[in-house]
A protein has these predicted regions:
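Generic detector of well-ordered alpha-helical segments enriched in charged/polar residues
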Residues: 235, 239, 263-267, 296
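Generic surface-pattern signal
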Residues: 243-247, 271, 297-300
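A short, conserved structural fragment
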Residues: 270-280
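Short, amphipathic alpha-helical interaction segments positioned at domain boundaries
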Residues: 287-300
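Minor-groove-contacting beta-hairpin "wing" of winged helix-turn-helix DNA-binding domains
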Residues: 281-285
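Short amphipathic alpha-helical interaction segments
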Residues: 256-271
Length: 300
């Protein structure tokens, strides 16, 4: 585009981004954001693998302007971490996060729920985790891409997610999106912008972007571009909000020919106890949080 772009967030993730040479990234950032500290609000997140964490790397990230760290811990169980082939123990992750906190107050972790052999009850390691000073936690259900055996059923996974949610609530982390919890004020601004329907640019293989009606996906051969209809764009941006505690405001959808169907579908989920309605705004209930994808599929 020939028009200047204003950025308020940067998210450097996917794989283990901190393993790469940061010099090219500095060049890209300096061309996009000459003065990052002048952007309000400004959030620059980098995802870290626990084994990537060193004093030198953290200082380098700090000098780059990073002010938020997300560390992929995945599990508190050493046997599960070994089966995941993560290459570290819970104690290693704990030490890495303590080092991160010396440089970055705004730091959180990712966890995966539903792995075979996972205990339902809280363990002494949860008590240790409570002392980490977490500002944010993303909790995802296992996607069984490896074809693991003895994967727990959906009801068991939902029970474990509920236990995890209550544990995080005791630490002051509130659920603000179906998979994300934060101390108030530490919500991920970058992801919130996406869920609120704002435009964003994705750089790199597999990264998606949205600018107006244009959609992009990074491929090995370059950037694949497509264009959606105004109706699709309006619905997509609105439906993303359903993932959050803010909920789906249907005001802008009333002009669509499909609005009666959308309204009937939403109201049916209210009766089912999966949504709650406040005027023209629909929000997921706790039960609805666990089946959000199914509700969105109904609306598509």
């Amino acid at each position: 585009t020939s028009q200047p772009l204003n950025f308020s967030t940067v998210y450097f993730g996917g794989g283990s981004p901190a393993l790469c040479d940061l010099a090219p990234l500095k060049d890209v950032l300096s061309s996009l954001i000459p003065h990052p500290s002048s952007l309000i609000p400004y959030e620059f997140t980098v995802e870290l693998h626990p084994l990537d964490v060193t004093e030198a790397k953290l200082r380098e990230l700090e000098d780059l302007g990073v002010n938020r760290i997300s560390m992929g811990v995945q599990s508190l169980d050493d046997d599960i971490l070994a089966d995941m082939q993560r290459g570290y123990t819970f104690a290693d992750a704990e030490a890495a996060f303590q080092m991160v906190k010396r440089y970055f107050d705004n730091a959180g972790i990712d966890l995966i729920v539903g792995y075979p052999g996972e205990t339902t009850a809280l363990t002494p390691r949860h008590a240790r985790l409570a002392k980490w000073g977490l500002r944010h936690c993303s909790v995802y259900s296992l996607q069984n891409e490896r074809g693991l055996k003895n994967v727990p059923d959906d009801e068991t996974v939902m029970n474990r997610l509920d236990i995890t949610a209550r544990f995080l609530a005791e630490l002051g982390l509130q659920r603000y999106e179906i998979s994300n919890y934060a101390i108030p004020g530490y919500e991920c601004r970058h992801n919130l912008a996406v869920w609120r329907g704002e435009d964003y640019i994705g750089l790199g293989e597999g990264a998606c972007g949205r600018m107006g009606l244009k959609r992009t996906v990074g491929r090995k051969t370059g950037v694949e571009e497509s264009e959606v209809t105004p109706e699709f764009d309006l619905k997509e941006r609105a439906f993303f909000r359903l993932r959050t505690r803010e909920g789906l405001d249907t005001t802008a959808l009333q002009s669509l020919p499909s609005y009666p169907f959308l309204r009937a579908t939403l109201d049916r989920n209210v009766v089912a106890g999966l949504l709650e309605r406040d005027g023209l705004v629909y929000r997921l209930t706790e039960r609805g949080m666990e089946v959000c994808d199914a509700i969105l599929a109904e609306l598509a």
